[in-house]
Amino acid sequence: MATVEVEQVTPVAVENVEVPTKTVEETVVETEVTQQPEESVPAVTEQKSEAPIVETNEEVVVEEAEKKDEETEKKTEEKDEKTEVITETPVVEEEEKKAEEVTETPAVVEEEKKTEVVEEKQTEVAAAEEVAVEKAEE
């Protein structure tokens, strides 16, 4: 809690001061009361017609509030579904592409290695044959 300091100011007492008093004269005005109720009755009915008052039960109010809540929940769920569809689709496609790349790359590398090994063997065999031919010629 906060503490609040308050300074009290006391007015200085003034001596021998006369305070003038105002005199008010009340005037009595007599009016005819018989015409006023007739005019005020239509005014009251006009107010009722402009803004009718409807009595409601607590159950009705609760039901209306629940309906509004359900409508807002449905709207938010629809928005969530739309955003989920948008975000899920690209992620799934990227994962599939990565999986394909991973599976294709080792297969291609292995095939290239196999072809290189075969080519090396062929060159070695050819070189060995050339050496054998040269030795035979000598």
Swiss-Prot record:
Comp. bias (Basic and acidic residues): 64-85, 110-122
Keywords of this entry: Abscisic acid signaling pathway, Calcium, Cytoplasm, Repeat
First and last residues of every Sequence repeat: 62-68, 71-75, 92-98, 109-114, 118-122, 131-135
Annotated region described as Disordered, given as residue ranges: 31-122
Domain of life: Eukaryota
Region 6 X 5 AA approximate repeats of V-E-E-K-K, residue ranges: 62-135
Keyword S-adenosyl-L-methionine: no
Tissue occurrence: Predominantly expressed in roots (e.g. in endodermis in the stele) and stems, to a lower extent in shoots, flowers and siliques, and, at low levels, in leaves.
GO cellular component, one term: extracellular region
Protein name (database record): Cytosolic calcium-binding protein 2
Organism: Arabidopsis thaliana
Gene, per the UniProt record: CCaP2
